[in-house]
Amino acid sequence: SAATVSDTFSITVANTNDDPTLANAIADQSIDEDSALSYTVPANTFADVDADDSLTYAATLSDGSALPSWLSFNTSTRVFSGTPLNANVGAITVKVTATDGSAATVSDTFSITVANTNDDPTLANAIADQSVNEDSALSYTVPANTFADVDAGDSLTYAATLSDGSALPSWLSFNTSTRVFSGTPLNANV
């Protein structure tokens, strides 16, 4: 006889948290100093197979220390923003961490390279007005700290004209190497 008997029962598969994963590495970024950075970490950078598990984001330097003062990270929009200055030229390594609802994390690092751009020299210390008596020799050295340039390795060259851009009077010369004005004005130059 082919008699059978059966019973039914349920098997419940309990969900356990799966750690989020790195799906797509974050691309390195480059920016010129004094330029505004705005970079959004792509939404598909990290993945989590757990249904209804949302990720939250944080960013630090790769060693866990805070981002430099010029750089901020919006944890809601995943946007890095800021304007690096001359002092920030070079590369930093940034770590972005995604955390799921069960506090499991995954991280990725990427570099932000700040390229140097030429900065104009600036007037650091105004040149004091000078006076000389007619028929007396003038010798005045423009102080070395009169002008400044924040660009490392830049050296300044000097030239002198009248304030309207025209040439110096014939009695006055300027040595561009030593920054020395010299000459003897006559009565006609008063």
Describe these PLM feature segments.
Residues 48, 74, 100, 149-151, ...:
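Acidic active-site catalytic centers that drive phospho-/nucleotidyl reactions
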Residues 1-3, 98-104:
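Short, solvent-exposed loop/turn segments at the edges of extracellular beta-sandwich modules
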Residues 64-85, 94-95, 165-186:
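Strand-loop-strand motifs at the edges of beta-sheets in extracellular beta-sandwich domains
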Residues 4-5, 9, 18-60, 87-91, ...:
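Extracellular ectodomain surface segments
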